[in-house]
Design a protein with these regions (language model features):
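Glycine/Thr-rich phosphate-binding loops of Rossmann-like dinucleotide-binding domains
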Residues: 24, 75-77, 159
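Short, structured secondary-structure boundary patches
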Residues: 12-16, 87-91, 139-141, 171-174
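C-terminal cap of metal-dependent C-N hydrolases
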Residues: 81-86, 145-177
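Histidine/acidic residue-rich metal-binding segments in metalloenzymes
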Residues: 1-67, 72, 83
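General structural signal for secondary-structure boundaries
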Residues: 26, 48, 103, 159-160
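A short acidic, glycine-rich active-site loop
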Residues: 39-50, 90-95, 170-177
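Short gly/ser/thr-rich secondary-structure transition/capping motifs
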Residues: 49, 130-133, 167
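His/Asp/Glu-enriched, well-ordered alpha-helical/loop segment
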Residues: 37-40, 61, 66-67, 73-151
């Protein structure tokens, strides 16, 4: 984040984002017994837990402008297991798009790290602006597309590959269980 801030201070138009896995998962996930850690092989790799609060600070301060997903789901059986015996053959990436909004809302807004307005900015408006789609996208306004997510912030669900409410992807695990 420091390099992004320094670049912007020099007048460089620098953009930085993060993904849910870096806010909620850490390198201990890659150290699970057996081959389970292969589920968490991604680029960049998961870091130590203390990095998560630094990323949340970056989101709060505007150093990180958006939260994407790098959604790249591979089934553990059949695909990730291709790397048994050869780390370089583990497909790089994991599922992320399906739980993004609830993770960021709960970890950010409910967790007291960001405001509801900042939540909307980092999950919708900022990306629309960066890609030149605003105000057609990324806002609720006359003349804008009605791309609306109806989200119940009070609903409680347990994220699980076995929960049909939280898991619709054709992948055999959920990184956030």
């Amino acid at each position: 984040l420091e390099q992004v801030v320094l670049a912007r201070d020099r007048g460089v138009s620098a953009f930085a984002e993060t993904c849910p896995q870096y806010l909620f998962l850490d390198q201990s996930h890659t150290e699970q017994e057996g081959f389970e850690g292969a589920k968490y092989v991604m680029t960049p790799p998961l870091r130590e837990k203390w990095n998560q609060e630094e990323l949340w600070r970056g989101i709060r301060m505007g150093d990180l402008m958006s939260i994407s997903t790098d959604h790249c789901p591979f089934c553990f059986k059949e695909q990730k297991e291709m790397g048994i015996g050869d780390f370089s053959k583990i497909p790089n990436g994991g599922p992320g798009v399906e739980n993004r909004m609830s993770l960021i809302f709960n970890g950010g807004v409910v967790g007291g790290r960001i405001s509801v307005n900042r939540f909307v900015e980092i999950t919708s408006t900022a990306s629309a602006k960066m890609f030149g789609l605003f105000p057609k996208k990324g806002t609720i306004a006359v003349g804008s597309d009605a791309d609306i997510v109806i989200f119940d912030p009070n609903r409680k669900e347990t994220i699980s590959v076995n929960n049909p409410v939280t898991h619709h992807m054709n992948v055999d695990y959920n990184a956030y269980e």
